[in-house]
Regions:
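A cross-family signal for N-terminal binding/gating loops and helix N-caps
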Residues: 1-163
Length: 163
């Protein structure tokens, strides 16, 4: 399948910048299995749409506050987006900085959490947090909720609860 088949124009005014204040106010896409017709319905209508024998999959996952902002030991700004936890103090993630990143460089997040760039694996980096603080504790205390690029605003406390 070609990637360009997924490109389409979506008017900016149709992109939600904030989640619905109540989940039942959220919208969902409903596809009729017989006609392939697509309809957009309020989530509060879900009970009337479910039939005996339908399979329901519940997703109770939460978005980890996986984005951190910091500085390199040289003073340059850096952004980390954690892709996965490797062990208690080590993560695999994307690093974005104004200049190239060197293995062995120190990063200081939020002025108090130190980490070391240990290795590069293609587009990702292995980062080890220093000291007693685990990676998950660092993310929980200083991490930001990663929002999709089309939501052009900083994250907030509501995002931590809703995502």
């Amino acid at each position: 399948m070609k990637r360009e088949l997924f490109n389409y124009k979506l008017p900016a005014n149709l992109i939600a910048r904030e989640p619905a204040s109540e989940r039942r106010g959220s919208m969902m896409m409903v596809i009729d299995q017989e006609t392939n017709d697509i309809k957009h319905r309020s989530f509060s209508e879900i009970v009337s749409l479910v039939k005996p024998g339908d399979l329901m999959v519940f997703n109770n996952t939460k978005v980890m506050p996986a984005r951190m902002f910091g500085k390199k030991d040289t003073g340059g700004k850096i952004e980390l987006l954690v892709e996965r936890l490797i062990d208690d103090q080590t993560v695999l993630g994307h690093l974005r900085a104004s200049k190239s990143l060197k293995i062995g460089s120190k990063i200081i997040f939020d002025g108090c959490i130190e980490a070391l760039i240990q290795e590069r694996r293609e587009d990702l980096f292995i980062i080890k947090f220093s000291g007693d603080q685990s990676a998950i504790d660092a993310l929980e205390s200083k991490g930001h909720t990663p929002l999709p690029p089309y939501i052009d605003r900083p994250d907030n406390d509501v995002d931590k609860e809703r995502y």
